[in-house]
UniProtKB/Swiss-Prot annotation:
This is Lactoferrin-binding protein A. The gene is lbpA. A motif (TonB C-terminal box) lies at residues 927-944. It comes from Neisseria meningitidis serogroup A / serotype 4A (strain DSM 15465 / Z2491). Residues 52-178 form the TBDR plug domain. Keywords: Cell outer membrane, Ion transport, Iron, Iron transport, Membrane, Receptor, Signal, TonB box, Transmembrane, Transmembrane beta strand, Transport. Residues 1-27 form the signal peptide. Residues 189-944 form the TBDR beta-barrel domain. CDD domains: ligand_gated_channel. PANTHER family: TONB-DEPENDENT OUTER MEMBRANE RECEPTOR, TRANSFERRIN-BINDING PROTEIN A. Gene3D superfamilies: TonB-dependent receptor, beta-barrel domain, TonB-dependent receptor, plug domain. GO terms for molecular function: ferric iron transmembrane transporter activity; siderophore uptake transmembrane transporter activity. It comes from the Bacteria. The lineage of its organism: Bacteria, Pseudomonadati, Pseudomonadota, Betaproteobacteria, Neisseriales.
Length: 944
């Protein structure tokens, strides 16, 4: 699968490469302090907004990207955002969407994601499908962010709940939306920005148009962005020359009894018809062909009783239908290409505000984003293979009209329905078996903002104060359609079971999940100084009234026919009365009373959170910088639902940092911080599809998960650039996981019986350690005769699990550390023309393979692996360039995987892991997870 074209990076090379990251380095750390203060005087506010040290002194584990960085890196989606940031990965949800980020060995709800300080939706699934066919109800995805609306992104690696609240165990990703000033050029009162981009790997086309103004105290902006794309295509070599041969079942009319020469076979007479018809039989039935029909043909030949032309035609029709299918057309578990997907999104961002008194601002914001991922699951076999003949056995083979294929069907394994039990329910052989998955997201936010701004170190009560209220609703709608209503080989997503299509069938397994947040935040900043010290104090308050609503909705439809024998006609011929086809509608909703997750009624949890935080970033003299902060959170969850957890959680988090600067070129930093995560809404709802719990039984209480982060770093800076090397250690305690726990419950007679209860438990403690390197070399600063603007960048991250301990009374069903990203190096060489007219860059990436030992876990006494395979090492090279024309037009282009290497990333292969929301564990061909081959992106930006 993997062709090794890697480059070697040694410790010597790292040392020589010294001092790198253009994307992570702070402008203020690249030059002397004196020159720094002079060059940043006019952009103090903006620099503070995007600085790595804006919240704590060390900057360790921080990555800050501006909208300019996103444009330069040609970020067209969530998978592009962290392309060159080792240690930060995207969690693939399995159905085209994503489940958030993976940082420091944890992922999903353990990495906080926020926009303008408002938390985004949690990843939510129901453990078990509603329709009984396997899989999971619910999306498991979070809403993705529209990057054209974003001004800055702060990625915080390591526990950080004192800044980001619940969920920041492994880290946090905080987005800030654009302001009017981001669209307006200096010296103007209005501005228009337009952008069009295309990415070939998923054929995504994006167009965005934004306008902003600032006049007489009023300012505002409006941005509209639309995207349309397809599934990400794997390497082109994957499907070259691949062809599948299949043998499928069909129907034939048994006109002759081949065992005897010229003997007619079984015929029947339908009520209302005059002529008898041959019974329909299954073509391709291996047992029948081997033990009867084909054997009889050979016996006839031996007995010199040749078949006549009609008999030979019937024998041919009785054989399996052989087809040769391309890689694009093939359906089944061995499919080598990914499922076809249609992706669309649309987003609005609007802001309007008024400045008055020189220091005050009042404004409002409106966001509305829709995303849809419409997929056809091509691992669902469209045809019925010869290995499925048994399910069509014992069918009468009678039919109405001339389509003899209507005589063959099978009874699906579905829930019993209320109604007439004499109705024959079945799925016809002649219909294509198809499965579609529709994943739709909607996010809407409305907010009000008051901001007070003053000069730093003023005599006023605050340098800055912000009061905001946001009302946000985020919903995911996941619908799985199973259709058997289009005649093979046709595929029709709009078809449904109907009376004119006997034994047609459709089912809908739908799940809605919605979170609502009403968030009130207040923050106050004040800078103080005296002869020896400088302080920057930040005091924060917040209140969040939240609600989680889950609603399953599963409907099934089946076109049924009453079929009953009425005896014989005058010629002793079977005679059937065939009732008219009718559509029988059935619903699992609420039918099985013990399975509460199948009741199609909203299930609600109300939540509230109050927090207060205080942070001080201060310096003593010129040698020491410090940061110290703490936060107090109190969360309440209440519900009227049976067997849903509720409770109060009080959590405290903190952070501290110290920087020692013996000279202006070198510093030593130490950072310590903590994090917590209260149980997610999914964990509060729990699992209740396996047992008939006795009345009064309560789920075991869950504690908040905890995290501790320790980092030490060495930093060099100067005219030559910047280098940071850090070592970190993270410890996680009381991690929540799905597990089996032996519990004694009374049976129907009242006697205690020990059974395994599968649910969420505080099950694990674990620790890991690692190394992180960031840097940038400015070659003109190293040697003055080299061109100004020539640079080299480096990023490296390695994480190694140290220990995992499980509760001895639990049998775990998942392993937490499959989220650890393999070690990765990213080395870049580039040039930016000093006046910004043009630039070019090459990025080299090398990743080690996934360690299989990190995938092993114990389920009881059995050793298991969360995936069947681990990724191998891989390397790739990307080239990008930009050209500015007359300051208003920028053309950007990039070629990725320029060497056209074939490889599989661990993030993609992890979709087969047990922890994936929509797992593809049944795949027998892993080519579908291969990374794209050589691909490109183009972008055209216009500013007026």
């Amino acid at each position: 699968m993997n062709k090794k074209h890697g480059f070697s990076l040694t410790l010597t090379a790292l040392a020589i490469a010294a001092a790198f990251p253009s994307y992570a380095a702070n402008p203020e750390t690249a030059a002397s302090d004196a020159a720094q203060s002079q060059s940043l005087k006019e952009i103090t506010v903006r620099a503070a907004k995007v600085g790595r040290r804006s919240k704590e002194a060390t900057g360790l584990g921080k990555i800050v990207k501006t909208s300019e960085t996103l444009n330069k890196e040609q970020v067209l989606g969530i998978r592009d955002l962290t392309r060159y940031d080792p240690g930060v990965a995207v969690v693939e949800q399995g159905n085209g969407a994503s489940g958030g980020y993976s940082i420091r060995g944890v992922d999903k709800n353990r990495v906080a994601v926020s926009v303008d300080g408002v938390a985004q939706i949690q990843a939510f699934t129901v453990q078990g499908s509603l329709s009984g066919y396997g899989g999971r109800g619910g999306s498991g995805a979070i809403n993705e962010i529209e990057y054209e609306n974003i001004s800055t992104v702060e990625i915080d690696k390591g526990a950080g709940s004192s800044d980001h609240g619940s969920g920041a165990l492994g880290g946090a990703v905080a987005f800030r939306t654009k302001e009017a000033a981001d669209l307006i050029s200096d010296g103007k009162s209005w501005g228009i920005q337009a952008k069009t981009a295309y990415g070939s790997k998923n054929r995504q086309f994006m167009k965005s148009l934004g306008a902003g103004f600032s006049k007489d105290g009023w300012e505002g902006l409006l941005i509209r962005t639309e995207r349309q794309g397809r599934e990400t295509r794997p390497h082109g070599d994957i499907a070259d020359g691949v062809e599948y041969g299949i043998d499928r079942l069909d129907a034939f009319r048994q006109t002759y009894d081949i065992q005897k020469q010229n003997k007619k076979a079984e015929y029947f007479l339908a009520e209302g018809e005059r002529e008898p018809k041959p019974v329909a039989k299954l073509a391709g039935n291996g047992n029948y062909l081997k033990n009867q029909l084909n054997r009889w043909v050979e016996e006839r030949k031996k007995n010199n009783q040749p078949l006549n032309a009609e008999e030979e035609a019937m024998v041919r029709e009785a054989q399996a239908r052989h087809e040769n299918l391309s890689a694009q057309s093939y359906t089944g578990g061995g499919r080598i290409l990914p499922d076809p997907m249609d992706y669309r999104s649309g987003s609005w961002l609007a802001k309007l505000g008024y400045r008055f008194g020189g220091r005050h601002y009042v404004g409002g914001v409106f966001e509305d984003t829709k995303q849809r991922y419409d997929i056809r699951d091509m691992t669902e076999k469209q045809y019925y293979g010869t290995d499925e003949a048994k399910k069509f056995s014992n069918k009468s083979g009678v039919y109405d009209g001339n389509d003899f294929r209507d005589g063959l069907y099978f009874v699906p394994n579905i829930e019993e329905w209320k109604g007439d039990t004499n109705l024959v329910k079945g799925i016809g052989l002649k219909y294509s078996r198809t499965k579609f998955i529709d994943e739709h997201h909607r996010r809407r936010r409305m907010g009000l903002l008051y901001r007070y701004e003053n000069e730093a170190y003023s005599d006023n009560w605050a340098d800055k104060a912000v009061l905001s209220f946001d009302k946000q609703g985020v919903a995911t709608d996941n619908n799985t359609l199973k259709l058997n209503c289009a005649v093979y080989p046709a595929v029709d997503k709009s078809c449904r079971a109907s009376a004119d299509k006997p034994y047609s069938y459709d089912s809908s397994d739908r799940f809605h999940y919605r979170e609502q947040h009403n968030v009130l935040n207040a923050s106050f900043e004040k800078s103080l100084k005296n002869k020896w010290t400088k302080h920057h104090l930040t005091l924060g308050f917040g209140y969040d009234a939240s609600k989680a609503i889950s609603r399953p909705e599963q409907l099934s439809h089946n076109a049924a026919r009453i079929s009953e024998s009425t005896g014989f006609d005058d010629n002793n011929q079977d005679k059937y009365l065939l009732g008219k086809p009718e559509v029988v509608e059935g619903s699992v909703c609420g039918y099985i009373e013990t399975l509460r997750s199948r009741k199609c009624v909203p299930r609600k949890i109300n939540g509230s959170n109050i927090h207060i935080s205080l942070n001080d970033r201060f310096s003593i003299g010129k040698y020491f910088d410090f940061s110290l902060g703490g936060r107090y959170d109190r969360q309440n969850f209440t519900t009227s639902e049976e067997l849903v957890r509720s409770g109060r959680y009080v959590d405290r988090s903190w952070n501290s940092g110290i920087v020692f600067k013996p000279n202006r070129h070198f510093s030593v930093s130490y950072r310590a911080s903590s994090g917590f995560r209260t149980p997610s809404f999914q964990e509060l709802f729990g699992i209740d599809i396996y047992h008939d719990y006795p009345k009064g039984w309560q789920r075991p209480a869950l504690k908040s998960e905890k995290a501790a982060n320790r980092e030490i770093g060495l930093q060099w800076k100067g005219d030559f650039g910047f280098l940071e090397i850090s070592s970190f250690r993270n410890r996680y305690t009381d991690m929540i996981a799905v597990a089996d726990h032996k519990t004694q419950l009374p049976d129907s007679t009242g006697r205690l019986t020990e059974i395994d209860i599968r649910d969420y438990y505080n099950a694990q403690n674990m620790s890991l350690q690692g190394v992180n390197i960031l840097g940038k070399i400015d070659w003109n600063g190293v040697y003055g005769k080299l061109p100004e603007g020539l640079y080299t960048t480096l990023a490296y991250n390695r994480i190694k699990p140290k220990s995992v301990s499980n509760r001895p009374d639990l049998s775990l069903r998942s392993y937490a550390l499959d989220a650890v990203q393999p070690s990765r190096y990213v080395l870049g060489f580039g040039y930016d023309q000093p006046e910004g007219k043009w630039g070019a860059n090459i990025m080299l990436t090398y990743s080690k393979g996934k360690n299989p030992d990190e995938l092993a876990y114990l389920a009881g006494d059995q050793k298991r692996y969360s995936t069947k395979r681990a990724s191998s090492s891989w390397s790739t090279a990307d080239v990008s360039a930009y050209l500015n024309l007359k300051k208003r037009l920028t053309l950007r282009a990039a070629i990725y995987n320029i060497g056209n290497y074939r490889y599989v990333t661990w993030e993609s292969l992890r979709q087969t892991a047990e922890s994936t929301a929509n797992r593809h564990g049944g795949d027998s061909n892993y080519g579908r997870y291969a990374a794209p081959g050589r691909n490109f992106s183009l972008a055209l930006e216009m500013k007026f």
